[in-house]
Amino acid sequence: MMRSVAWAALSWRVFWLSLLWTAVSAKQDKPKIDSVMLEHPPLNLNYFEDSDVIVFQDIEERNIYRSEDAGFTWNKVKELPDGGSAFLYLHPFESSTAFVLTKDRKHYKTEDRGKSWTEFDSGSMPSAFQPDTLIFHAGDPKRIIFNGMNCDGIFCDEETTYTLDGFKTIQPLRPSTSGCWWAKSNTEFTTGDEDLDKTRILCIVTDPLSIFKTSQKLCVSDTFFKKENNGKYQEFEPTLDSNRDVTGVVSLAAVKSFILVASSSANSDEMALYVTSNANQWHRAMFPSDDSHDHSHQINQEAYTVLESTNYSIQIDVMTSHPSRPMGVIFTSNSNGTYFTENIPYTNRNIKGHVDFEKISGIQGIFLVNTVENGKDVDEGSAEKVVVTQITFDDGRTFEPVKAGDQRIHLHSMTQINNIGRIFSSPAPGLVMGNGNTGKSLGKFDDSNLYVSDDAGVTWKQALEGPHKYEFGDSGTILVAVRDSAKEDVDKVSYSLNYGDTWESVPLPKDLKIRPALLTTTQDSTSLKFLLIGEHDKRYHMVALDFEALEKSTCGDKDMESWNARVDDKGQATCIMGRKQTYKRRTKKADCFIKSNFKDPEPINEPCDCTDADFECDYNFQRDPEDRTVCKRVGSIPMPQGACKDKDDKFKGSSGWRMIPGNQCKRTKGAQKDDEVERKCSEGGGGNSGGDGSSPSVPANGEISHKKNDFDSEALDMQKYYLIRGDSSSGTDETIIARPIGERTGNSVQVENKVWLTSDHGKSWKRILDQEDIMKIFHHDYFKDVMFFSTKTDKILYTIDRGQTFHSFKTPVASDDFTLSFHPDKKDWLIWVGKHCDDVSGSKSCFPAASISTDRGDHWKTLVRYATKCEFTGNSAYKYRPLTQIVCLVHQEENLESPKTIVTINDFLADDKLIHNGTVASFATMNEFILATDEVTEAGKEKAGLQAIASLDGQHFEAAQFPYNFHDSHSSLYTVLDSSNHAVNLFVATDLSDGRRRGSIIKSNSNGTTYVLSASNVNSDEAGYVDFEKVAGLEGVTLINVVANPDKKDGKKEIQTKISHNDGAEWDFLPPPSKDVDGKAYKCSSAGDSKCALHLHHYTERDNKRRTFSASKAIGLIFGVGNVGSTLGEMKDADTFMSADGGINWKNVKKGAWTWQYGDQGSIIVLAERATHGNGAKTKTVSYSLDEGETWNEYEFTDKEVTILDLTSVKTGAARNFLVWCRSDSKQLFSVNIDFTGLTDKACEYKDDASASDYELWSPKHPLQKNDCFFGHVAKYLRKKKDRKCFNKATLSLLHGYENCECTRRDFECAYNYELDNHGQCSLVPGFQPLSGEEWCKQNPNETTWFEPTGYRRLPLTTCKDGVELDKTSDEHACEGYEDEFKRKHRTSGWVIFFAVVIPIGLAAAIGWYVWRNWSGKFGQIRLGDNSSTFDSDQPWIKYPVIAISAVAAVAAAMPLVIISLWRSATGVYERVSNRSRGGNWSRRYTTRDSFARSDYSMVDDDEGELLGEESDEEV
């Protein structure tokens, strides 16, 4: 705050100085200088363009200050409400206009550079989720998009509005957006149509059925998303990628004449970038092959930076190194932004993503870059960075050292920025300054000196000693510098009037000494006035300088010279980027000022004839190191669509050269260097393939092929780990890691220390890590192309690029097991829990400790001591807890003998923690739920019991509410089943006797507060596994096995299979086929009842727990092994059955028990007769179908019968390659790749004309409904027609659309304390009466109304509207005290929701997670109530109540296709808005009521060898 004393002093000072000025003006030889003191730092300081008017934001006061005289005097803007200014925006396309936004809907605007302000209403608050609230139209300054949010309570819904008249009026845009932009957001951009330039808007649109970022898409409208009569919006989804439908759009950026869109996908953090130069045609940004480089070319989230680009090309720096040693590669695109070529590797970056790169302003083709000279050694972790500075004069084609005389100099750049604005240059022609040093490499900043160049970086000279902040004025005739210091010891400002040859200084006024913060002037560097801001004694000083006081004359023609941007040795102008560029600037010795205020220097350009210097290597070509005149091919050449139908064909392709983008040379007659030449098809590739991964590399021959590979091993079997790609991946490899295993002993398995890797799905294998002693192999829990390998020491190996390279780190403390925890959004964030041991005076003691790393293990710090378990609970999808939140199970009082409790840590700070008030046995996370068991003492009992507690926000834990009398007949053994469908499915054991294990499945409501019975007598085994599995890709379809004879205490269990088509609300028997595969009728027939049905062997009987009935991309296909009858028979008598319609109809396809795999989205099915314990089958063929099981063919893959150990493929069912794992009679282990890509090379196409389309639309059905409504909507999926000879693109989006339906009985399930009776109706649980309204309101004190109970509640999955709403009656009543609110039709308060849901978030019982790594590597169990020694892992699990995971395979498979994403782009909330540079302190809010109530369910992946491949967790 500016104190009145300061203003009074300033007024008197101005008065006396004015008198003195009259007396001494004739003798003034120094610039005018004065200062004003501030209480708070002036943030967001901006000049209004072409003026001396400056405004800044006082972030503490929340006020705006303004100066009309370049900073000599300041006044608070009084027309704005005191303390209400949250954001300050200057209009980028209207120099006199600015906006001040508040935290509310009322905002302010000026159109006269801040002299006057008018109020306007935006209709919503500024968005907390978008980086920019105001999006300006570059062609019409009155057109503005307002990205806002509507917050009635603690929940905020994003909403977007727009104005066409500068906020005189405002209109809503489309709902369900995550940011909108004008296509013409830059002056350089155009659609090519003036009308479209005015109206075209691009929005990232969210999916109403999903809140995941990976379901978002890009929509375009030219009519402001006008809503039609049918309720649809006038919009279209642009074809971003010609090979696939693109979802997962997370960001959009306008870059000069281009628009960039980034998309992400599950399983990987690789990004796909799409580029357009007209908002009509889009292309995926294609980066060259990295096969011939020692660094990657992959684009990952938070690992690329779009550099300062031009109208004709995009430049991107891609981080290719370890995050703690950041380095990158600069790429430059061609003229349409599609094909990128590498400029220079090993650029110097910092962890914030800043790159040491800057173009020289106003001169084309010149930029300075810092590179790491020993980049390869640094990347391998064996050296510190040696940073050197280089300069290019041909836009990155060649680079030269920067020299001052004969000495090389190195300059500090963006990674050590010490001022605002550009680093080295300004619009002043040819003038460049920088802090640096001479020598072999860049030194410390404090040891640098100031250097200056007046010929655009060709030659340099030292200007001043020590590091400085600097600025340019009067088009370069004035250079101003102030020494950069961390101390408050700077008392002068230096300046030069002859391009840095000589320097003078002026003292700061009033003997002031400061620590300089910034030095600035007008954006165009034409002004004679400068502003210095510094700190002294915790106060801030605005020091203004004015060189007009020197009273220099205005330069005339005799004072000016023609300066050539590039000259030869003789000083003659030479060509740069195809033209000679000349500026008019003042001669060095002229004693005058140009005084062309606010007028940018204009160059004179003269084109040159094209030469070899105007060309560079094209996409996937690079310079031959032995002959720099040759560009050699290092990757496939893009070829025209439809080329190379025959392998002997040729096509016209790149010569290897392209003109440097932006080069303006004049082509001469005759052949051109970049003319296309004839190429062999073997040299070509898919061009803009988009990483489809399914396009064949050679033309199809109509045949299936196979290739065998022997393994040098005497083991019995192989572990397999598929590295799953995301849809945004640019690669096409199908990578698998395998190693031999031997006999199993209990929970352990013998392994050989040999590891193989294949990148072509088993066609070729290579040994890897043969010098390492590998113990265990693990996937990253969320990024499936990242693998970790533990060793016998503290060394952990890993790969982040699918096995191309391997790196390592050391664990901070020892551990008995692999105890890494992973963050769902941040690939490099790790938690390690291990033993910390001290040896003091011969006394050794150990305690558990958790450590954290944010750079993938390079550096560790202790997170919390005496912690036995920690997990990242922060997730960008869960807005109600911070991204940095961690929950740990910790011994109280740092004593191993003390009970454990939950500790919640925010921001990785052990001091910032919340300790749960209670004794906790254990905890687990499942999607958005944090679940635990609290030890409590029941009334009248001395022994403590276990109480289920849970939380959504990680801070407030409350008990769950089970059905009435539920615990009277149930044990405390719990198993968490798949909880992906907006609710927790919990198995609770009822019978724990040997051979009779069974229990009940209970299901929570959508916010997890209460549970109802879903199914009784569900089968389980002694390991805690349950016969429960959701059908992959189909919403709410679940298969279970139940015990048909629960009352018989002796004898064998009789098992029956049931299916639910409405998420467990109702269960039916599987209808049996009438005939078997041989056409013979079964002994019984029915529509599926207790006497006759199809029964399938389920999860508890599987040798390989990774097996599932279905695959996520083979929608509606289900395979199983079983029999027709009253109950399930023996496995030896089982046959193989399938359904093609989601389990409604079944048929027998094979006699005997066969294993299956899906391929090509279900259009390929492969069956193999696998050997089991009861069946030592041998064969030399597999069976396959290309028409969804209607017909079957045999394929012989070996000439002798062998034992098939396994049949595998990519788990999603999208690949066209399969692997058969075999053992010969001679005990030789081998694999056989079976490749179906040769059958066709034609990609299937969807067309609106059903007869011409290769696809038909298929909708899942409920067997008891006449229409196709399924969970309140008709979903339409693409299915390839059975007779079409084409392949499905691997990234094909199967969900084609959906329409909501009216509600029916199938959209409801039984409410709390109700259960299905024998008539299929929801009846009260015996012994319980419905709550009265008074009781309901008393038990729910924050509710305002109550409905008379109906016994039904709405299914969390359903989207139905209106119709039969069984959860409501016609009678709604107000709770006492809320009558007035009820009369106002009761608008639910956000705070009511907060106290009713967030804080008392009563939830599930003691619930488990999918892997318990701290007990002998046994998969699928975590121990609850375990008070034994921390490191004692050999106790039998039966001794304690246990949570086990069952059918985790189904967890991954059951994710509904419409919400199948794991990876989200982080959505920011205001913790401190100052992080956005516009200031403000905002409370954190939830995004939507729906996202809170139903929350954000992520997929627990069952990737092979990790979650379900128990081999990966076995003892070695």
Swiss-Prot record:
Keywords from UniProt, A to Z, are: Glycoprotein, Golgi apparatus, Membrane, Protein transport, Receptor, Repeat, Signal, Transmembrane, Transmembrane helix, Transport
Q: Give the signal peptide as a residue range, or say none if absent.
A: 1-26
The record's Gene Ontology cellular component field reads:
cytosol; Golgi apparatus; membrane
Q: Which domain of life is it from?
A: Eukaryota
Q: Which residues lie on this side of the membrane: Lumenal?
A: 27-1390, 1463-1516
Is this entry keyworded GTP-binding? no
Which SUPFAM superfamilies does UniProt cross-reference here? Answer: Oligoxyloglucan reducing end-specific cellobiohydrolase
Segments spanning the bilayer are 1391-1411, 1442-1462
Q: A Pfam family this protein belongs to? A: Sortilin-Vps10
- CDD domains found in the cross-reference section: Sialidase_non-viral (cd15482)
Region annotated Disordered sits at 642-709
Instruction: Give residue spans on the Cytoplasmic membrane side.
Output: 1412-1441
So which residues have sugars stuck on them?
Answer: N311, N336, N917, N1007, N1342
Biased segments, Basic and acidic residues type: 671-682
As for membrane topology, the entry says: Multi-pass membrane protein
In this chain, composition skew of type Gly residues spans 683-693
Coiled-coil regions listed in the entry: none
Q: Where in the cell is it found?
A: Golgi apparatus, trans-Golgi network membrane; Prevacuolar compartment membrane
**What does this gene product do?**
Functions as a sorting receptor in the Golgi compartment required for the intracellular sorting and delivery of soluble vacuolar proteins, like carboxypeptidase Y (CPY) and proteinase A. Executes multiple rounds of sorting by cycling between the late Golgi and a prevacuolar endosome-like compartment.
Family, as annotated? Belongs to the VPS10-related sortilin family.
Q: What is this protein called?
A: Vacuolar protein sorting/targeting protein 10
The organism named in the record is: Fusarium vanettenii (strain ATCC MYA-4622 / CBS 123669 / FGSC 9596 / NRRL 45880 / 77-13-4)
